[in-house]
Amino acid sequence: MKIAFRMDDITPDMDWKSFEAFEQLFECYGCYPLLGIVPDNLDPKLSVDPAREAFWKKMQELQEKGWTLSMHGCHHVYTTKRGGSFPLNAQSEFAGKSYEEQYQLLESGQKKLLDRGIETKLFMAPGHTFDKTTLRALKALGFTHVTDGFGDLPYVRSGMTFLPIAFLRKYAFSDREGMTTIVIHANHSTVAELKAYEEMIDANRENIVPYSDFFKLEAKQQPMTARIREYVLAFGKGLAARLGRLKKQHA
């Protein structure tokens, strides 16, 4: 199995020390990841360091170098209690809203990126949550790809190509054919966590590839049975995570 990486929550006011540490790691091994850029961050949880004016120029330079960029929502603010079509979480910036509301949010995010010199047709939903209305609005705005879903090959659904993430990290390291994504949230990463990623990449370097390799693979239509299975897996994984957090709160 070929493995690529994606980094969520990329903003001008992110944890720059962690980001730059991961940047050096990916540059060292040449496995350029996908970056999920929040066009207009209003989520205080993502605000770690003072915003850097050079952020947008930095993103342009990384894109020119071979890193892949995506639009990570618009504001990264959860305003509904819906899990949508891929319910890893029970909250969303998009799922459950009308077409007009979602189109306006997505169009606003797209314009903010374009105004800063960044063009992408790849969408990354905050919290992994979206619905069929999100996909319809994305398609109307010219987006072609979504980074989400479970699987080991790209697939087509509702006219959009999905580039899957790993259901469980341990399943990504198998002898099966295909390609999947490991998700990284770099803010507040520890030295130990960074070291673990370095060891992971070094031990599997023959299977670690740039995210852009996804675009070389053929995408096939997702069967309804696979869609149902994916929904059940996402709901179960999300529920287990929420129950785990609840247990810790009452421990």
Cite the ranges covered by each PLM segment.
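Active-site beta->alpha N-cap acidic-glycine motif
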Residues: 1-65
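Hydrophobic faces of well-ordered beta-strands that scaffold small-molecule active sites
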Residues: 3-7, 33-35, 69-72, 120-123, ...
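Active-site beta-loop-alpha junctions enriched in small/polar residues
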Residues: 10, 38-42, 74-76, 150-151, ...
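Alpha-helical scaffolding within the catalytic cores
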Residues: 18-22, 51-60, 151-172
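Generic structural signal for well-ordered alpha-helices
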Residues: 19-23, 56-60, 106-110, 135, ...
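C-terminal domain-boundary segment and adjacent tail
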Residues: 30-37, 188-251
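Short, flexible, mixed-charge acidic loops at enzyme active sites
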Residues: 77-89
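Catalytic domains of cell-wall/extracellular-matrix polysaccharide-remodeling enzymes
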Residues: 93-164, 190, 194-195
